[in-house]
Amino acid sequence: MGIQGLAKLIADVAPSAIRENDIKSYFGRKVAIDASMSIYQFLIAVRQGGDVLQNEEGETTSHLMGMFYRTIRMMENGIKPVYIFDGKPPQLKSGELAKRSERRAEAEKQLQQAQEAGAEEEVEKFTKRLVKVTKQHNDECKHLLSLMGIPYLDAPSEAEASCAALAKAGKVYAAATEDMDCLTFGSPVLMRHLTASEAKKLPIQEFHLSRVLQELGLNQEQFVDLCILLGSDYCESVRGIGPKRAVDLIQKHKSIEEIVRRLDPSKYPVPENWLHKEARQLFLEPEVLDPESVELKWSEPNEEELVKFMCGEKQFSEERIRSGVKRLNKSRQGSTQGRLDDFFKVTGSLSSAKRKEPEPKGPAKKKAKTGGAGKFRRGK
């Protein structure tokens, strides 16, 4: 789930924190990708006639096709991906996981009813709701990545938290996921739609945490409290407090404790045994990979082993897989170039689709030229 309504809230109240780019803009960038989120997207999107791709034994292969070709596309555009896989979910997430199980059970009932009624659109909708990333999906994707020469890491807990830690440490330029709580975990830059289907033609969205905090007038701990009020995977929120009201309350009172002291409990009942303090601690000090111990290396693909796995075991076309390997090898030759802004300071500012910031004048203009977007430039 991530954080409910956070993307829209940022677009509404801190639009300069969002930048849209074409994939070509990320040449030379290292990016930490939430693997489970990507695999889920592949299982949803890579389909034939509404059904997931399968081999003759009935094994699902959509995740492998998606991982293979989307990774090649990133490499061809000069992006160096590292995939981060989920570890053990935190105990605080048990309530959210139980709710998901309930929703799956309900979707199974609705799917059966839709099948009996012959309602094709409803069947497709509820089938997608039942999609779940399994250990087998993860293990097969790890094997594929190792054969492709693409690094992956196992997070001790939530993948997006470790993605954020790598970005904070400067090991990568950004964390890539659809879950907005990557910002809550402190990633300086969050990228959305990086692994989305090309057919959707979605521009990649960048969310810059420093601009979010600046425009909202909050520090990181206050931003975490705002996200808890909006609704997260780790504890309940206060019913009746919408996004705009949550922002107003945090800006005025600075913490959940101060807000609760002033709330009318008859209008805004606080959840019983509310675990907001524990959720705050989890966001501020999550269990993550140690960035200093991480060494990222992209190596040559093992063509024959890839053919053996993807064609021999999973029954993909050998011609297509070998063609993909050629593209991958060619992309590796091109990606040895660095980015110009790794050597020269880049000036400018983030643009917003919603609001263009006024051009500074006089001394302010001179100051803006020497500062600009340098604070957003990350050298990895």
Curated annotation (Swiss-Prot):
Its EC number is 3.1.-.-. Mg(2+) 2 binds at residues 179, 181, 233. GO terms for biological process: base-excision repair; DNA repair; DNA replication; DNA replication, removal of RNA primer; memory; positive regulation of sister chromatid cohesion. Mg(2+) 1 binds at residues 34, 86, 158, 160. The modification Phosphoserine is found at residues 187, 197, 255, 293, 335. GO terms for molecular function: 5'-3' exonuclease activity; 5'-flap endonuclease activity; DNA binding; exonuclease activity; flap endonuclease activity; magnesium ion binding; manganese ion binding; RNA-DNA hybrid ribonuclease activity. Binds 2 magnesium ions per subunit. They probably participate in the reaction catalyzed by the enzyme. May bind an additional third magnesium ion after substrate binding. Residues 1-104 are annotated as: N-domain. The modification Phosphothreonine is found at residue 336. Residues 336-344 are annotated as: Interaction with PCNA. DNA binds at residues 47, 70, 158, 231, 233. Residues 122-253 are annotated as: I-domain. Residues 327-380 are annotated as: Disordered. It is found in: Nucleus, Nucleolus; Nucleus, Nucleoplasm; Mitochondrion. Keywords: Acetylation, DNA damage, DNA repair, DNA replication, Endonuclease, Exonuclease, Hydrolase, Magnesium, Metal-binding, Methylation, Mitochondrion, Nuclease, Nucleus, Phosphoprotein. Residues 363-380 have a biased composition (Basic residues). SMART domains: HhH2, XPGI, XPGN. The modification Symmetric dimethylarginine is found at residues 19, 100, 104, 192. Belongs to the XPG/RAD2 endonuclease family. FEN1 subfamily. Interacts with PCNA. Three molecules of FEN1 bind to one PCNA trimer with each molecule binding to one PCNA monomer. PCNA stimulates the nuclease activity without altering cleavage specificity. The C-terminal domain binds EP300; can bind simultaneously to both PCNA and EP300. Interacts with DDX11; this interaction is direct and increases flap endonuclease activity of FEN1. Interacts with WDR4; regulating its endonuclease activity. Interacts with POLB. This is Flap endonuclease 1. It comes from Rattus norvegicus. The lineage of its organism: Eukaryota, Metazoa, Chordata, Craniata, Vertebrata.
